[in-house]
């Protein structure tokens, strides 16, 4: 694939994730949109690594680290969401006012 096609795809994924993160009222949907943004960034890392120097795998290795961090972030985020759901019976972001007390 050409570099421009991959960059357009990555920009589209990033913009959809950013739009979903801004407009989302559900915590789980916001986490999914954040993962979509991170996947767009990973796609850029791998694409530029392949485009500039295909012999070295620096972009691919860095994207593996980002995937590992994103998996940990998703696990912690889902644990927090399930804890809030058990206490508040809702996963809506605007109803979660835990810091007001």
From Swiss-Prot:
Its main location: plastid. InterPro entries: NADH_UbQ_OxRdtase_chain4L/K, NUOK/Mnh_C1-like. It catalyses: a plastoquinone + NADH + (n+1) H(+)(in) = a plastoquinol + NAD(+) + n H(+)(out); a plastoquinone + NADPH + (n+1) H(+)(in) = a plastoquinol + NADP(+) + n H(+)(out). It comes from the Eukaryota. GO terms for biological process: ATP synthesis coupled electron transport; photosynthesis, light reaction. It is a multi-pass membrane protein. One of its GO terms (molecular function) is oxidoreductase activity, acting on NAD(P)H, quinone or similar compound as acceptor. It is found in: Plastid, Chloroplast thylakoid membrane. Keywords: Chloroplast, Membrane, NAD, NADP, Plastid, Plastoquinone, Quinone, Thylakoid, Translocase, Transmembrane, Transmembrane helix, Transport. Pfam families: Oxidored_q2. The chain crosses the membrane at residues 2-22, 32-52, 61-81. One of its GO terms (cellular component) is chloroplast thylakoid membrane. Its EC number is 7.1.1.-. Belongs to the complex I subunit 4L family. NDH shuttles electrons from NAD(P)H:plastoquinone, via FMN and iron-sulfur (Fe-S) centers, to quinones in the photosynthetic chain and possibly in a chloroplast respiratory chain. The immediate electron acceptor for the enzyme in this species is believed to be plastoquinone. Couples the redox reaction to proton translocation, and thus conserves the redox energy in a proton gradient. NDH is composed of at least 16 different subunits, 5 of which are encoded in the nucleus. NCBIfam families: PRK05715.1-2 (NF004320), PRK05715.1-4 (NF004322), PRK05715.1-5 (NF004323). This is NAD(P)H-quinone oxidoreductase subunit 4L, chloroplastic. It comes from Helianthus annuus (Common sunflower).
């Amino acid at each position: 694939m050409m570099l421009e096609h991959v960059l357009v795809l990555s920009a589209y994924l990033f913009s959809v994730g950013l739009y979903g993160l801004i407009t989302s009222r559900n915590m789980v949907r916001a986490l999914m949109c954040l993962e979509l943004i991170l996947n767009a960034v990973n796609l850029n890392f791998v694409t530029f690594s392949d485009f500039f120097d295909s012999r070295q795998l620096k972009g691919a290795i860095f994207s593996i680290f980002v995937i590992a961090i994103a998996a940990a972030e998703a696990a912690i985020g889902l644990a927090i969401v399930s804890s809030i759901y058990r206490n508040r019976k809702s996963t809506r972001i605007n109803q979660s006012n835990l810091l007001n007390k």
